[in-house]
């Protein structure tokens, strides 16, 4: 048992010291802000929307009040909604800057979101904007968001500038699970490494991505990733081959989509967890074993172990609680939640297993009534 405790502790020492400082939450859009450019490039926001009637007015409304000095317009693609999303959007006062398209039927080989985005980017291309702002229909933006995005992109000559929208943490389930969702994402894709052109690590956050249009065309467009469930990270990887990218935390972009209970969060995570493992049962087995060692062994040894096993388990538990503190602080949560990380890790392990089971049953990648992982898993 002391060997297991020592392994868990060694893993957390590695994560704290050698994993790009992911846990420090230093990469944020309100730090090291870029100077404003002398010329403001043209931008078109592309918003895919499917059954978003409850939030579409707020999300699109936040785009229409952007304090952006350059040419800026919005293209919303109504992806066969059945709840009046398109009708509500058409009723907004867009002052001639909002165009609402009715999406075509989903062709084979495409995920729904990427197909809707592809139609929007094709329409936007008619105006030859320098940037495409890919954002979701359930995200609201502060008025200065686009101005800050463009300033950073122009200063760094970035091909993708992406913000990790702040998710809601109002319900008990959200408080327990949502900060850890971002923590785990940052662990998988350390933002410092994503932002380092010398490293191959690449990712993006789909809720807010400012993309240089010519670079996207050179990369093969959205068609190059048309069947990918984890569309944002695959877009980040595609675009990093074209130039530098940047990803950071923000309070300027916030999710309008609450998660009322554990079931909704489980569905959100399960949609893409098995895709993250390339639909491999062997990677799933290894991941489950790894999660047991990294998250569960420490508290078990700390409580029930003896001698060295207990002390290494306790040290590993303290290390993971320490690592969680900056993200808890960013989300305004008590430091005590850090000691719940083993429980949270166990729940996410269950969500990952659920994701695999859903894929095997033909319901993988479920999004807005569509099982999108079937072809990808074959």
Give the residues covered by each predicted segment.
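Catalytic donor/gating beta->alpha subdomain of glycosyltransferases that bind UDP-sugars
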Residues: 153, 157-186, 214-217, 222-283, ...
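Cell-envelope/extracellular polymer assembly enzymes that use nucleotide-activated donors
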Residues: 41-44, 73
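Short beta-strand-to-loop acidic/aromatic patch adjacent to the donor-nucleotide binding site
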Residues: 129-140
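A conserved acidic beta->alpha catalytic loop
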Residues: 69, 78-87, 104-106, 139
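Membrane-embedded multi-pass helical conduit in multi-pass membrane proteins
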Residues: 283-362
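N-terminal membrane-anchoring/stem segments of glycan-assembly enzymes
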Residues: 1-37, 178-179, 191, 348
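Active-site nucleotide-sugar/metal-binding loop of Leloir-type enzymes
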Residues: 115-131
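Short, acidic, metal-binding catalytic loop of nucleotide-sugar glycosyltransferases
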Residues: 61-71
